[in-house]
Amino acid sequence: MMVIGSIFFRRRVSPAFVVTLAFLFLVLRSVADDQITKKDGTNITGTILGVSGDQVSVESHASSGGTVKGLYYISDIKSISMATPAEVTKVQAQGVEPAAVIAALEPQVKKFSGLPADWVVQAMAQLAQTYAAQGQADRAVAIYNQIDTLYPGSKYHAQAVAGKAELSFKAGKIDEALAAVQPIVDQANKDIAPSPSDGATYASAFLVYGKVLEAKKKPQQALEAYLTVKTMFYQNPNLVDQADQLAKNLRDHNPGIGIE
């Protein structure tokens, strides 16, 4: 019996077994880590700690077994793969108290704003929308301006445009809001397979578009805009919930309305 146990023990700690375990550990660790690909093709794996100025701070695993921190210029980064923090995900659903949204998103936005990752800009936009809903339009505008400043000439500009258009609509500037979102709506109608981030931006624009159409007494077209968010640009659950509620309210006030 002891011989069998001894053989079993030796097999468990054989070099091949140890190598296999080490390989599995590295695979699992790499899956959990954030990934940065630089424009020169270099890959950095580790944990993104935050943004300071024009650099990203990353904690990586050293070959010695410890960790090492490095700074990388944002301008040198081609792409980033980073899971959305749980603090952000939990407040994306409709119905979360504004105070909870602000408490969850403010630290994340402060820590990661400027990072070229979709979830960061979406969190900034949601934070701005929450401020606007609380009557703090100046803080909302400041965040949208920050998006334009931190991501000049990027795809995220449309997110800021849609956000400012929402504020224009709330201020009663209907035509100004329409003029702002119309180019985004036109682009969305041409985009057959939008990315998740583009889908979220289009959803924001279509929500404003629908509200403008409602204000212009075009309920059928407004309903179509809301349903487009639900069926085509459904990547952000919070925006889908908003579209669903707007469509429901519209139907309640316009019995028998439908899409041709």
Model-derived features: positions:
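N-terminal secretory signal peptides that target proteins for export/translocation
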Residues: M1-R12
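Bacterial N-terminal signal peptides
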Residues: A16-V27
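Compositionally biased alpha-helical segments
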Residues: R29-L150, Q159-D175, A179-Q182, A188-K190, ...
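Helix-start (N-cap) detector for alpha-helical repeat units in TPR-like alpha-solenoids
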Residues: V121, K155-A158, A203, P237
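Short acidic/polar micro-motifs centered on Gly/Asp/Asn
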Residues: Q129-A132, G210-E214
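N-terminal low-complexity, intrinsically disordered tails enriched in Ser/Pro/Gly
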Residues: G199-A200, K211
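Terminal, low-structured helical/coil segments at or just beyond the last alpha-helical repeat
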Residues: P219-E260
